[in-house]
Amino acid sequence: MMKKALLAILAGLTILASAPGPAAVPAAAGGDLSCYTIVVGKAASADGAVIVAHNEDDSGAILVNLRKIKARDYGAPQTIDLGRGAKYAAGARTAGFLWIEATTQEFADSFVNEYGVLVTSDSCPSREAKSDVTDGGIGYMLRRLLAEGAKSAREAVALAGTLVETYGYTGSGRTYTIADKNEAWMMAVVRGRHWCAERIPDDEVAVIPNHYTIRAVDLADGSRFLGSRDLVAYAKASGWYDEGKEGAFDFKRAFGRPGRPDLVTDGNTLRHWRGLSLLTGKTWAIGDAYPFSFKPEKKVPAASLMALLRDHYEGTPYDATDGYKTGTPNRTKFRTICTASTINSFVASLRADAPEPLAASLWIAVAKPDTTLYLPLYYGVAGLPPGAGLGPDDHDYARLYKEHFEDAALKARKDQLLHTKVLAVQTSAEADYARMRGRIDGLLGSFEHELVANRAKLESDISALYGRDKEEAVRRLTAYVKDAFGKASGLYDQLLRK
């Protein structure tokens, strides 16, 4: 009986969505799906790392596919197709990068490259209706070009700004979080050719749901702000900013699409409020003018953000299931931080004081984090563990693009992915949440707790070994990650057998 049930669950995951060819990406969709990001400056984190924590939300028959693509020297500059007809002149060399791929999706992938530059994003619908683009503009390829070419977060922001101004952005609006081991930026882009980026202060934390969070802007202060030179003038000309009536320019107010009048159910305000409340330890009113960034109550450990990414407003007036008594908390009238459309989650640490194999690390969950566990992953591993991802690891512009949007070949092998087992458990849990959550916490939660508790010693041992024998240190780190993924796979098998 359980075998039949499992087969039924897996069958439900095999529905294939049609995908476009390599020069025709789909129209931007799902713009209001609720991703969520927390950024912690290096002086606000417990260990001096820049931290980026993110829930990715999307819909459809998506594979969460982890890949580590090797650096490549093509020997000559390359001309890149951006997907809708525009061409980009790239250099001869591409950086290696870790790729958290959501197949067929235009705006859902996250990257960490060999220089420790991280790129992820949150949809932030703008009020711009005019599509000002050249040769189809740029959408999907924006973040991948940053991963392939940028050596620092600031360089990535500048490159992204040039790309947006040159080609025009195809989506309604989005905020890209771009970070490295020294600093983090949030870059807000608007349909067409306008953008603005703000640096998160080292001793502060920033939270973003799915609306712009940049408020005051001073483009004369290049250490804190970057952006389109005509940003304010364009807002005035468009009728979105009246200096005489409004006073100082406010980017969110000028460019953001107005949300629903009911702030409790607008999908963003509660999630913003919850992050602020938990990280500051202060009381915030629903609808306050929330700051772009803030000082946390105490220094933030990376692992502590896992609980925040799993949050459903438990213990608040907005806990709509009364502690899971009435079913899944992922499908209620109050859109939660962890929600029905969350497809993956990660907490990334970017550290300047760690040896190369440990400098960029992730806690990665390949589905909704409330019904799975976070597994350790380091950029410095020699290769990804079995079950993490599918597809070749060598760089080829056209092939990687085509495989991403035409994923039938990957889906034909999806039973090899840990992601498939995780989805089967997730489907079972959503149908009987309180009972399954208890089992999941007992099995997966215990293993995750063990991984977190042992992390400091592991990294200390690897650091010491790296000073003596770099190859052996990488080998042991790779074996550790492989072992963690293998044990997790066995635990999912246990959950699916009963």
Predicted features, each with a name:
Residues 318-450:
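Substrate-recognition/cap regions that form aromatic- and gly/pro-loop-enriched pockets
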Residues 25-37, 321-327, 334:
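Short, Gly/Pro- and small/polar-rich lid/capping loops
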Residues 1-9:
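Bacterial N-terminal signal peptides that target proteins for export
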Residues 428-498:
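Histidine-centered catalytic/metal-binding microenvironments
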Residues 263-331, 335-340, 431, 447:
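Accessory, solvent-exposed terminal regions and/or long lumenal/extracellular loops of proteins
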Residues 26-139, 159-293, 297:
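A contiguous strand-loop segment
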Residues 156-165, 305-309:
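Short, well-structured alpha-helical segments that form the helix of a local strand-helix-strand
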Residues 8-17:
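Bacterial N-terminal signal peptides
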